[in-house]
UniProtKB/Swiss-Prot annotation:
Molecular function terms from GO: ATP binding; magnesium ion binding; methionine adenosyltransferase activity
Family: Belongs to the AdoMet synthase family.
UniProt binding sites for Mg(2+): 16
Subunit structure: Homotetramer; dimer of dimers.
Annotated PROSITE patterns: ADOMET_SYNTHASE_1 (PS00376), ADOMET_SYNTHASE_2 (PS00377)
Primary gene name: metK
Cofactor(s) this protein cannot do without: Mg(2+); K(+)
The protein's Enzyme Commission number: 2.5.1.6
Reaction(s) catalysed by this chain's protein: L-methionine + ATP + H2O = S-adenosyl-L-methionine + phosphate + diphosphate
Function noted in UniProt: Catalyzes the formation of S-adenosylmethionine (AdoMet) from methionine and ATP. The overall synthetic reaction is composed of two sequential steps, AdoMet formation and the subsequent tripolyphosphate hydrolysis which occurs prior to release of AdoMet from the enzyme.
Protein name (record): S-adenosylmethionine synthase
Organism phylogeny: Bacteria, Bacillati, Bacillota, Bacillota incertae sedis, Caldicellulosiruptorales
GO cellular component: cytoplasm
Length: 396
């Protein structure tokens, strides 16, 4: 049976992604000086204005307006005619401390208060919020990500590369990509449709943009065997994309959660990542769920695997662990879930310890996806639990 699936990505200059990157740049700057800081940093951007807000509890000082301007400059917004200017935009900050009502549950988990866990056992911290988190992996690509989002991210990164490298100097920072993949019997066989929308200078013609993007962006990224004469390609389908960035649309942190994860191919718990320190399970437990799912697929126990975790605020142990292999598992999903419980410690402090999350590693994942990153050595992307998973599978 044939079916189509579509995923999108955005470039680092997309207004929402500007916000994600500033949020994580602030987080990184704080973690570099104070690894145990509590950070929840949100950003909004609009024409000529950046608003940085949130709750931060830390012993250190960081220059938030400078961090915001530096991030905007790195993205490429250096002139007002691009839609934003790092040097002339206004930066407003509104920062409070973390609520003491939240802090009391994170500082000491319910289990520790009840004497079920010692204070010094992996810090004995509770989850920073309730909620459910999903992780996913599949064998469609070398990085065990779904093909549509994998290709959409690569196209978006290529847009930034040809812009910053001067290959297509008329491009500007804002842009989006979208890829529709055709599947036969659940395996990707071809790319059905590609959409690329990229901001550009007013002088360049649509025909030139179309030809250049096909030659310098699409052809180097999409595998030749995945393109055919029936593949539909749309480049700037409105015909013009000069006004972009925060001048074209306002932006907010956490508004691209599907781009950040699996492109809609797997379920999502609803929590965003950027600007949150690792005591927030929205971030750390979603990373852990990906780590679990990827190791299960890498071990060959399934072709596809989705892991759901759930937490209560102030409680360390996950309330539930669910595994779904969509009928591709070599053993029952319930048995795989038992293996997960034996192999992975999914309490927040253990996740932070095992994935070494109290480091300034977040800004670089704030654009082009948090998962399946071939360009980064991310701890949640490692497949170092394969051997122990296979050993446990033999004993079950």
């Amino acid at each position: 049976m044939r079916k189509l699936f579509t995923s999108e990505s955005v470039t680092e200059g997309h207004p929402d992604k500007i916000c994600d990157q500033i949020s994580d740049a602030v987080l990184d700057a704080i973690l570099e000086k104070d690894p145990y800081a509590r950070v929840a940093c949100e950003v909004a951007v609009t024409t000529g204005l950046v608003l940085v807000m949130g709750e931060i509890t830390t012993k250190c000082y960081v220059d938030i307006p400078k961090i915001a301007r530096d991030t905007i400059r790195e993205i490429g917004y250096t002139r007002a005619k691009y839609g934003f200017d790092a040097d002339t935009c206004a930066v407003i900050t509104s920062i409070d401390e973390q609520s003491p009502d939240i802090a009391m549950g994170v500082d000491k988990a319910l289990e520790a208060k009840l004497g079920e866990m010692t204070d010094d056992e992996i810090e004995a911290i509770g989850a920073g919020d309730q909620g459910m988190m999903f992780g996913f992996a599949c064998d469609e690509t070398p990085v065990l990500m779904p093909m549509p989002i994998y290709l959409a991210h690569k196209l978006a990164r290529r847009l930034a590369y040809v812009r910053k490298g001067g290959i297509l100097p008329y491009l500007r920072p804002d842009g989006k990509t979208q890829v529709t993949v055709e599947y036969e019997d659940d395996r990707p066989i071809r790319v059905d449709t590609i959409v690329v929308s990229t901001q550009h200078s007013p002088e360049v013609t649509h025909a030139q943009i179309e030809a250049d993007v096909i030659e310098h962006v699409i052809k180097p990224i999409i595998p030749e065997g995945m393109l055919d004469k029936n593949t539909k390609i749309y480049i700037n389908p409105t015909g013009r994309f000069v006004i972009g960035g925060p001048q074209g649309d306002s932006g907010l942190t956490g508004r691209k959660i599907i781009v950040d994860t699996y492109g809609g191919y797997a379920r999502h718990g609803g929590g965003a990542f950027s600007g949150k320190d690792p005591t927030k399970v929205d971030r750390s437990a979603t990373y852990a769920a990906r780590y679990v799912a990827k190791n299960i697929v890498a071990a060959g126990l399934a072709k596809k695997c989705e892991v759901q975790l759930s937490y209560a605020i102030g409680v360390a142990r996950p309330l539930s662990i669910r595994v779904d292999t969509f009928g591709t598992g070599k053993i029952d999903d319930e048995k795989i879930a038992e293996i997960v419980k034996r192999v992975f410690d999914l309490r927040p402090a253990a996740i932070i310890r095992d994935l070494d999350l109290r480091r300034p590693i977040y800004k670089k994942v704030a654009a082009y996806g948090h998962f399946g990153r071939e360009d980064l050595d991310l701890p949640w992307e490692r497949t170092d639990k394969v051997d122990i998973i296979l050993k446990e599978a033999q004993n079950i």
